[in-house]
Structures are given as C-alpha cells and as structure tokens.
C-alpha cells in the first residue's frame, strides 16, 4: 500500500516577518503538493481561506504561540477567533512553566478549555521537548490523552531543537494508539527516518 506523505504535512510559515506574498506562496505550494494544511498565524486565516477555497488543503492556526505562557482565556479567545475566521485545526502551545511546576490541573484545564472552544475541530498540543525532561514529556503526553486532544507535537521551531528520534519514540510509547504524533521537521531532518 502506497503512503502519501504529503497528506500528513502541515506546510508551515509562522515567522513574524512573513508578508502577504509569503503566505500566498505558501498556499500555492500547499495546493501544488496537495499538503494536508497550511499552518499560519491567526492574522492570515481569512487570506488563506480565500486562497485555498477550491482545494483540499486545510488551515491550521497556532494559539498561545510560541511560548504557551498566556492565560487559558487568551488561548480560548484565539481558538474561537481562528475557527470563526475559517481555520480547520488548532495547534496550541503547552503551558511549559505550569508543567514544570507540576501544576497538572492548570495544564489539563488549559488543554480541555481549548479543545472545548474548538468544538469538533482537531486540536494538537505542542510540547517544546527541548525544554522538558523525559518525565515531563511523559506527563504532558498523558495529560493530552486525558484532555481528549488528537495530537501531540514535538516543538514550535522557535527554540533550540525540533524533533529527535529519542523523543519521538518516547512520545509514541506514551500515546500509543490514543493520539497521533506530529513532528517539527526541517527538510534535511527527513533523513532521520533511516534511524527508525
């Protein structure tokens, strides 16, 4: 059976200096390669909706990005506005400080409230593994399962490292079949697959 990798790719542009033309180019590439979604900041959702209207490409928006340190109410507001403007999926950033403080109720509530605000839309949580210990990664994955999210992701791309084989194996062991796993992978890191 042939696996179409392109349908698993969120073609992403989250740089603060991204221009309208950059977003147009991103959407054109996503259509050309039939990617799953474009992942953009919420200010670009309406433009992407217009550009992608005759395609099978969806729109992912980030909330609490890139730090995850904002109030849950802010993430909920961002989520509602993103969906109102036409986004299909939400990538929320984990409240890393709360996880490190072992304030698991806050972390769980943060995820649950975003999921609730997203209604039936897919919600992924970005863990930022390079800032977490092994035990923190495990706990974050367990909380994501408990919150009813669909995916856990490795990183924002705004910190010191993205996906690595060790973390991906750990995350997949924890979430097993309960959640899906998304990796932040730069093109040259695709060579990691040879290590599986």
Swiss-Prot record:
Compartment(s) of residence: Cytoplasm
SUPFAM superfamilies in alphabetical order: Aldolase
Assigned EC number: 4.1.2.4
Matches recorded under InterPro entries: Aldolase_TIM (IPR013785), DeoC (IPR011343), DeoC/FbaB/LacD_aldolase (IPR002915), DeoC_typeI (IPR028581)
GO CC annotation: cytoplasm
Domain of life, source organism: Bacteria
UniProt catalytic activity: 2-deoxy-D-ribose 5-phosphate = D-glyceraldehyde 3-phosphate + acetaldehyde
Alphabetically ordered keywords of this record: Cytoplasm, Lyase, Schiff base
CDD domains: DeoC
Entries under Pfam families matching the protein: DeoC
Transcription among keywords: no
One example of a Gene Ontology biological process annotation: 2-deoxyribose 1-phosphate catabolic process
SMART domains found in the cross-reference section: DeoC
Classification via NCBIfam families: deoC
Role summary: Catalyzes a reversible aldol reaction between acetaldehyde and D-glyceraldehyde 3-phosphate to generate 2-deoxy-D-ribose 5-phosphate.
Record-stated family: Belongs to the DeoC/FbaB aldolase family. DeoC type 1 subfamily.
Entry protein name: Deoxyribose-phosphate aldolase
Native organism: Mycoplasma mycoides subsp. mycoides SC (strain CCUG 32753 / NCTC 10114 / PG1)
Gene name as annotated: deoC
């Amino acid at each position: 059976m042939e696996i179409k990798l392109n349908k698993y790719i969120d073609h992403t542009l989250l740089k603060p200096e991204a221009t309208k033309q950059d977003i147009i180019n991103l959407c054109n590439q996503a259509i050309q390669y039939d990617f799953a979604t474009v992942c953009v900041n919420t200010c670009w959702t309406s433009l992407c909706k217009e550009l992608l209207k005759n395609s099978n490409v969806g729109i992912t928006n980030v909330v609490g990005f890139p730090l995850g340190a904002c109030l849950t109410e802010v993430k909920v507001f961002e989520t509602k506005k993103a969906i109102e403007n036409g986004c299909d999926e939400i990538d929320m950033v984990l409240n890393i400080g709360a996880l490190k403080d072992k304030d698991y109720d806050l972390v769980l509530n943060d995820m649950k409230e975003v999921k609730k605000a997203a209604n039936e839309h897919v919600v992924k949580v970005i863990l930022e593994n390079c800032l977490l210990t092994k035990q923190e990664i495990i706990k974050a994955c367990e909380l994501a399962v408990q919150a009813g999210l669909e995916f856990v992701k490795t990183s924002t791309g705004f910190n010191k490292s993205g996906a690595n084989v060790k973390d991906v194996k750990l995350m997949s062991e924890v979430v097993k079949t309960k959640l899906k796993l998304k990796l932040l992978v730069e093109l040259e890191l695709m060579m990691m697959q040879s290590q599986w």
